């Protein structure tokens, strides 16, 4: 092996005392490597990753930027620009949905994550779509998914109040159902969860909860002990069910957590689809997705991806380098699809290994997750085919950080530190130049006990260069960003970076 990129997902470097699990954890291995190797920090948010100013980074954007080696203008920014220019309602896919319901007399069903977290969606985009419906003179209904993960665990009450105010202002856009993202945005094939959100949208039999108003849905949930992420799917009095003649616009711009619900609503069932016996019979309506959720979906896409060319994976393949991508299922798409610039198919010489994430409701119940098995996969590969380049993701600091459980987050960080002690020596012994970094922070700020912080952070992330024993320890320059990682790997491999990669090697 020649080079290895080890992504410590959610491992940020804070400078405060707000329950920083990274600082509080006992991390002798990472500390030793940071001291022994060349150490620097990278920025991961805002314009440095193609997002609006002041917007925290996320795993999708982070891995996309890492693989592209340049700043890629994200869908979030493109949607914001369209709204600012007054072009959203005239977007071909969105205007097509509006035309459809204008012709049929049906309802435009807008659905998505209602928060200002900006990781999967932004509530302002949902507000703007309601305004589009009002401007066209058609009825709209909103199916609101509450956040509590990229935002405050109890911020949903305010977000839904804002949404209800938008509906009042425009005379349409009443909330028809409310579901926590735990149900509506599952990405781990927990189809029974997704089906519950589907049932609330279609008003199928078996919806357990009903509320007089959207805000009541979350306040009732709080009384049951469930915060925004876990609001059980609830129908709202007087809300419209998805029916024949209607149309759907799914406002989430991030794909991974929108795919399962889209499959159920658009009746997309490939031959090898396994949904644990879940059966649905949705009305045959157009389902517009804000971005391309899956290249196999036959859905109109409002903002198709502008896929970057000459990504890290493409360049490695062009130079006949074999590459191994390893992650547990929670982050598998990130080290494959997103790192490859939105490409579903592996490059020549690219091997992908997925390790199942633990089957637990939330990862504070098992902070180590599947990190040991991820490491074992690489050790087995080193003893076998020994690929030229490795990209690996340890999910723990991010996934456990999202629970807001400080003690569990400490355990998660320490679990990753233990794995680094097994992994890095083996990589160096195999001749690999290892790099440790992160895509964004999370476990570095868990807020306070009274006000847990479960979202990503704006803090910089580490970049540690660990050459093999025979290699030189070049210094890591200041001013680095995620776009500089791919050029750095190409540098140690002796490959010229493509001109489209505007990042530069971090090694001085």
Swiss-Prot record:
InterPro entries in the cross-refs: Alkaline_phosphatase_core_sf, BPG-indep_PGM_N, Metalloenzyme, PGAM_B_sf, Pgm_bpd_ind
Binding site for Mn(2+) 1: 398, 402, 456
EC number: 5.4.2.12
Pathway in which the depicted protein is active: Carbohydrate degradation; glycolysis; pyruvate from D-glyceraldehyde 3-phosphate: step 3/5
Acyltransferase in keyword set: no
Class in the EC hierarchy, top level: isomerase
Residues at the active site: 59
Transmembrane segment boundaries: none
Residues involved in substrate binding: 120, 149-150, 181, 187, 254-257, 331
Key words of the record: Glycolysis, Isomerase, Manganese, Metal-binding
UniProt: Mn(2+) 2 binding residues: 9, 59, 439-440
Cofactor: Mn(2+)
Disulphide bonds in the chain: none
Record's catalysed reaction(s): (2R)-2-phosphoglycerate = (2R)-3-phosphoglycerate
Keyword Transcription: no
GO CC annotation terms, alphabetical: cytoplasm
One term of GO molecular function: manganese ion binding
Note on how the cofactor is bound: Binds 2 manganese ions per subunit.
Coiled-coil boundaries: none
One BP annotation, GO: glucose catabolic process
PANTHER family: 2,3-BISPHOSPHOGLYCERATE-INDEPENDENT PHOSPHOGLYCERATE MUTASE (PTHR31637:SF0)
Protein purpose: Catalyzes the interconversion of 2-phosphoglycerate and 3-phosphoglycerate.
Stated family: Belongs to the BPG-independent phosphoglycerate mutase family.
Protein name per UniProt: 2,3-bisphosphoglycerate-independent phosphoglycerate mutase
Originating species: Halobacterium salinarum (strain ATCC 700922 / JCM 11081 / NRC-1)
């Amino acid at each position: 092996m020649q080079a290895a990129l080890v992504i410590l997902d959610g491992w940020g470097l804070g400078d405060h005392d707000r329950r920083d699990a990274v600082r509080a954890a006992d991390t002798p291995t990472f500390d030793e490597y940071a001291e022994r190797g060349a150490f620097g920090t990278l920025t991961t948010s805002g314009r440095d990753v193609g997002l609006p100013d002041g917007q925290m980074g996320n795993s999708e954007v982070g891995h996309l930027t890492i693989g592209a080696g340049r700043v890629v203008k994200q869908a979030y920014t493109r949607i914001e620009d369209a709204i600012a220019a007054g072009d959203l309602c005239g977007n071909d896919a969105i205007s097509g949905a509006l035309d459809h319901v204008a012709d049929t007399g049906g309802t435009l069903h807008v659905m998505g994550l209602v928060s200002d977290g900006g990781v999967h969606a932004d509530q302002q985009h949902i507000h703007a779509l309601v305004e589009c419906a009002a401007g066209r003179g058609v009825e709209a209904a909103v199916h609101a998914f509450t956040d509590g993960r990229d935002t405050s665990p109890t911020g949903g009450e305010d977000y839904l109040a804002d949404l209800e105010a938008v509906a009042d202002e425009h005379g349409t856009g009443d909330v028809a159902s409310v579901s926590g993202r735990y149900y509506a945005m599952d990405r781990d094939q927990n189809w029974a969860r997704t089906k519950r959100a589907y049932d609330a949208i279609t008003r199928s039999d078996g919806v357990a909860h009903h509320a007089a108003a959207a805000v009541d849905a979350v306040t009732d949930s709080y009384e049951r002990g469930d915060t925004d992420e876990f609001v059980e799917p609830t129908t709202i009095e007087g809300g419209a069910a998805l029916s024949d003649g209607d149309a759907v616009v799914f406002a989430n711009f991030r794909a991974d957590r929108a795919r399962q619900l889209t499959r159920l609503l658009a009746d997309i069932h490939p031959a090898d689809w396994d949904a644990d016996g879940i059966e649905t019979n949705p009305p045959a309506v157009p389902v517009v997705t804000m971005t391309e959720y899956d290249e196999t979906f036959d859905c109109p896409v409002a903002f198709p991806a502008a896929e970057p060319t000459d990504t890290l994976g493409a360049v490695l393949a062009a130079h006949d380098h074999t590459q191994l991508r390893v992650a547990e299922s929670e982050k598998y798409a990130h080290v494959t699809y997103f790192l490859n610039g939105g490409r579903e198919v592996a490059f020549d010489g690219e091997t992908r290994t997925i390790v199942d994430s633990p089957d637990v409701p939330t990862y504070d119940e098992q902070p180590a997750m599947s990190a040991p098995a991820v490491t074992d996969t690489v050790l087995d590969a080193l003893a076998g085919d020994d690929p030229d380049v490795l990209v690996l993701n340890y999910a723990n600091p991010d996934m456990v950080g999202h629970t807001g459980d400080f003690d569990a987050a400490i355990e998660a960080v320490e679990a990753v530190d233990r794995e680094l002690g097994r992994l890095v020596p083996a990589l160096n012994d195999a001749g690999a130049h290892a790099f440790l970094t992160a895509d964004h922070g999370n476990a570095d700020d868990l807020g306070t006990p009274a006000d847990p912080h479960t979202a990503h952070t704006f803090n910089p992330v580490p970049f540690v260069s660990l050459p093999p024993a025979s290699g030189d320890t070049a210094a890591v320059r200041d001013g680095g960003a995620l776009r500089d990682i791919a050029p750095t790997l190409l540098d140690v491999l002796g490959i010229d970076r493509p001109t489209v990669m505007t990042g530069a090697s971090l090694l001085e």
